[in-house]
Amino acid sequence: MGTPLRRSRRLEGLNPLSLENLPDPEVSRAKRALVDFKSNPEETRELESPRVPPLDLVSPQPQPETSPESPCPKQDAGFGSPQRQPEPHPGSLQLHQDLGLDSPAGQTESNPESPQREQSSKLSPTQDSEVAHAKEEVIPRSPEPCPGQQAPGPEPSQPAQELAFQAPSSPERQLEPSKLPPAGESVTGSLDLKKRVIASPQAPASKKLKEELPVIPKGKPKSGRVWKDRSKKRFSQMVQDKPLRTSWQRKMKERQERKLAKDFARHLEEEKQRRRQEKKERRAENLRRRLENERKAEIVQVIRNPAKLKKAKKKQLRSIQKRDTLALLQKQPPQRPVAKV
């Protein structure tokens, strides 16, 4: 990997830091500082000289945005470390601070006016609190390198956008300090949660199997004859109890309904009788009118000679009727006396 474009004169003898040659987190800070001092004596001399301005020591790369879930990239980017460590550790946090000696900015703990102190003072109080909470978190230890290896120089750090992208998607994201469970309950809580997640899909499956089974009704005949069903009774065997007392309003309402029903039945009967009587009277009137019309239309001849009656045939005798001829005689005065029979 190539070195960055802007490098100071004191970083010429440093070797790049690789993931395989990570320093031992258990080595003390004083011992590691002594080894770095022996390897690069010119570096400390230049830091002690007042001619070197502190602004040139700042890393040219911007600080990436950090989230409360991943405080490790914030410290690495602020101190100019080359690459984000696998996971933060109380021992590894101390290691990150000590690695500032080998960073491209050439920072050491002996110089109080170094850019490391300036950057730490510029941090907001919220970031300081998040860093303090991150130190208190319980995290598995990082892999340790061989004790005989020396802490080499760092590699060029990754871009700020890549660090910010990897921070929220870390698989082993830790909980916030306010939500941390007790030490004894952390493992049991996760196991109970897994059991619930595994047991939940099995419960609905068993219920579905029970619901799918056909329910056989007891006592129901196969032919479907309802009157043979034990649970049902015949209409004649059903007993419908009347209420013990009925309200006065209900009594009056029922009485009014009965009265209206009787009046309507009587009205229908009277209407039927009236129609029958009218029909009978009309028939009698028609008969009387017919007879009157026949008499008006017939031709009457008064037979005064009895000899004609003796000579008349049976057919003629049928049409002869004995009537009162006084009215006719009065209308038509007789011309001769009527023959006495």
From Swiss-Prot:
Residues 261-304 form a coiled coil. The modification Citrulline is found at R323. Residues 105-114 have a biased composition (Polar residues). Residues 64-73 have a biased composition (Low complexity). It holds the Pfam family Cgr1. It is found in: Nucleus; Chromosome; Nucleus, Nucleolus. GO terms for cellular component: nucleolus; nucleus. Keywords: Chromosome, Citrullination, Coiled coil, Nucleus, Phosphoprotein. The keyword Cytoplasm does not apply. The modification Phosphothreonine is found at T66. Required for proper chromosome segregation during mitosis and error-free mitotic progression. This is Coiled-coil domain-containing protein 86. It comes from Rattus norvegicus. The gene is Ccdc86.
